[in-house]
């Protein structure tokens, strides 16, 4: 179910909240901003403002009821004598206010957020779409056909807008391709000045002579690549403060507070701290705040280069069964839990918190499921990236051979021998076989549904360029060869920009991953050991002291380790999401694979450090 269908059902369910629905509709239409209406139009949501407002009110009510449930649990935990703990009162106030307000804000602002996301993603499609247009124009200086080619070959959101533009031209909304390009440039110029400039350069290039045209087209690509690189540089420079805030708010301050909780109980008898408040604060409130802050950071990330889509029909995915993987993961988690319980039964120890077994079980389940489900996708994605990296050099070798006037079959077999050992060489070898042995033409040798060499190549970039080659060869081998060599240069430019962007962001994302997967578990483990020492020391003080054992007695070591362990797991999810979002954008495959890979290591590290810290600090206690 998507946002629209949920919104419609929710709006019908919550109509009772507003009484006269017609009056509410009228009031809602007047109260929303023009930006809100534009966002609905841009995203294509067939919703009315009143439906979204009703859904937001209903969500706030549900969130309020959920917060009351948490408050009731805290009250029950304190036997309904809440006045004995200031910290519990603070947590109850925060949950009661924060949850409904967050729900109201998220739902009511969702169309704006979605529209902003779509615009950012479309801006990331610019290098690919513009490169298709430029590549086509170098082979055939027909502006309308170049736009049709880009709209047809690209699966990006910007290409959808191009298809809409071409349709508008067909039904005479725009009189000519020049008018259509002017409209499109002005429309997107609000968000991307470099796209506007590049489109005007492309439009002027078709009216120039051959050499000048190629120079202008090259300049348009340079403008786009420089603009994309500049955007990412600006974004990376602005990331320093937000990442520092996340590191402070998410790792250092919360984990330092863990060791302070026993000491805080000394301040006043009314600063009683229970496990329920710590659970709500660490495992619900704090992760929620971090989640929305991370979401805000990633919403400002400019998209760069779209990821290659992987169809479910891929041969390596045909036998993939997510339900089966979930069952296997569940069995693995059960086995780990069983072994842990057997170990505790025969080797009980005060330095080994039994709640660690629950963390192991979750880590085993999630890691097993993620790796078995997403490893095939990751392997395919890596193969596509490897082939695309090889393709620039391969295209240059192929283009040079065709430029010499050699027939396609000879050029492909020569390139396959020159690039022997690479994945793209196998594709070229198969193409040559189709041309020579099966007597196919170039297009069929590449794209035939049964025997085409690109049948199992899922890179839209490679497929689009090979279509250009097939079209160019029909007209002139020499001209096609020259164009392919120039296209190879463009491709290398694109790859160099991608690489430089990765290098710029690499230091930051590697620091985030190291913090999430190594430093946070180590700091948490050491802090839990210190907490154990402080608790033991304070509980050993005379009863006449200001510390009352009851203030901290309800935080049993097992529960405390479990709550902090859950928080560490949440940190691993959140910080890896931030690192993945900065590095790759919205790449679910890479994210889930990374979590599956890092989670067990981090939980094992947390376990070892916690046990060693408790053992070390226990020897120091009086």
What annotation goes with each model-predicted range?
Residues 1-45, 290-319, 342-346, 374, ...:
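Membrane-cytosol interface segments
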Residues 1-30, 183-216, 448-483:
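Short, non-transmembrane cytosolic segments of multipass membrane proteins
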Residues 92-184, 320-328, 338-452, 464-472, ...:
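Juxtamembrane/interface alpha-helical elements of multi-pass membrane proteins
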Residues 280-295, 327-341, 570-572, 601-611:
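Alpha-helical transmembrane segments of multi-pass membrane transporters/translocases
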Residues 102-106, 287-300, 339-342, 367-375, ...:
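Alpha-helical transmembrane segments
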Residues 80-98, 270-285, 346-364, 553-566:
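Hydrophobic alpha-helical transmembrane segments
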Residues 60-86, 249-273, 335-351, 520-546, ...:
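Juxtamembrane "helix exit" motif at the C-terminal ends of alpha-helical transmembrane segments
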Residues 24-66, 72-80, 111, 115-127, ...:
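Membrane-interface, cytosolic juxtamembrane amphipathic helix immediately N-terminal to a transmembrane helix
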């Amino acid at each position: 179910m998507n946002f629209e269908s949920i919104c419609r059902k929710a709006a019908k369910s919550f109509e009772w909240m507003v009484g006269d629905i017609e009056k509410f509709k009228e009031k809602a239409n007047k109260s929303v901003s023009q930006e809100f209406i534009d966002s609905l139009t841009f995203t294509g949501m067939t919703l009315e403002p009143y439906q979204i407002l009703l859904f937001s009110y209903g969500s706030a009510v549900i969130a309020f009821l959920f917060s009351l449930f948490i408050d009731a649990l805290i009250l029950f935990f304190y036997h309904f004598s809440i006045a004995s703990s200031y910290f519990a009162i603070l947590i109850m106030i925060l949950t009661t206010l924060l949850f409904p307000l967050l729900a109201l804000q998220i739902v009511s602002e969702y169309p704006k957020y979605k529209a902003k996301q779509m615009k950012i993603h479309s801006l990331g499609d610019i290098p690919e779409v513009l490169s298709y247009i430029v590549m086509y124009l170098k082979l055939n200086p027909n502006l309308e056909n170049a736009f049709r080619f880009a709209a047809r070959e690209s699966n990006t959101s910007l290409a959808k807008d191009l298809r809409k533009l071409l349709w508008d031209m067909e039904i005479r909304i725009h009189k000519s391709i020049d008018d259509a390009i002017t409209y499109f440039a002005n429309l997107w110029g609000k968000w991307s000045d470099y796209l506007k400039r590049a489109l005007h350069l492309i439009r002027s290039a078709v009216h120039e002579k051959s050499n000048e045209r190629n120079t202008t087209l090259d300049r348009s690509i340079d403008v786009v690549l420089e603009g994309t690189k500049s955007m990412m540089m600006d974004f990376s420079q602005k990331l320093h403060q937000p990442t520092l805030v996340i590191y402070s708010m998410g790792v250092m301050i919360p984990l330092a507070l863990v060791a302070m909780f026993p000491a805080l109980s000394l301040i006043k008898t009314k600063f009683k701290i229970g496990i329920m408040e710590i659970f709500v604060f660490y495992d619900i409130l704090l992760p929620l705040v971090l989640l929305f802050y991370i979401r805000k950071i990633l919403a400002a990330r400019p998209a760069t280069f779209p990821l290659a889509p992987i169809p479910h029909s891929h041969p390596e995915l045909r036998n993939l069964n997510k339900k089966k993987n979930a069952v296997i993961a569940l069995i693995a988690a059960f086995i780990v839990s069983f072994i842990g319980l057997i170990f505790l039964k025969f080797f009980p120890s005060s330095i080994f918190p039994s709640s660690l077994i629950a963390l192991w079980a979750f880590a085993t389940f999630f890691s097993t499921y993620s790796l078995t489900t997403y490893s095939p996708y990751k392997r395919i994605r890596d193969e596509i990236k490897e082939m695309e990296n090889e393709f620039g050099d391969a295209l240059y070798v192929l283009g040079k051979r065709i430029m010499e006037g050699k027939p396609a079959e000879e050029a492909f077999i020569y390139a396959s021998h020159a690039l022997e050992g690479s994945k793209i060489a196998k594709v070229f070898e198969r193409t040559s076989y189709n041309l020579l042995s099966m007597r196919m033409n170039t297009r069929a040798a590449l794209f035939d549904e049964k025997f085409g060499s690109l049948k199992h190549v899922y890179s839209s970039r490679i497929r689009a360029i090979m279509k250009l080659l097939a079209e160019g060869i029909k007209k002139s081998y020499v001209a096609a060869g020259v164009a392919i060599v120039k296209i190879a240069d463009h491709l290398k430019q694109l790859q160099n920009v991608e690489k430089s962007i990765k290098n710029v962001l690499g230091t930051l994302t590697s620091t985030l991953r190291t913090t999430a997967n190594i430093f946070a578990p180590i700091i948490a483990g050491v802090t839990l050991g210190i907490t154990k020492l402080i608790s033991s020391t304070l509980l050993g003080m005379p009863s006449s002291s200001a510390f009352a054992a009851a203030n901290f007695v309800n935080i049993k070591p097992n529960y405390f380790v479990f709550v902090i362990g859950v928080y560490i797991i949440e940190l691993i999810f959140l910080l890896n999401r931030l690192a993945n979002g900065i590095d790759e954008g919205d790449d679910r495959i890479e994210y889930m694979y990374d979590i599956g890979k890092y989670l067990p290591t981090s939980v094992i590290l947390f376990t070892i450090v916690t046990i060693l810290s408790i053992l070390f600090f226990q020897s120091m206690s009086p």
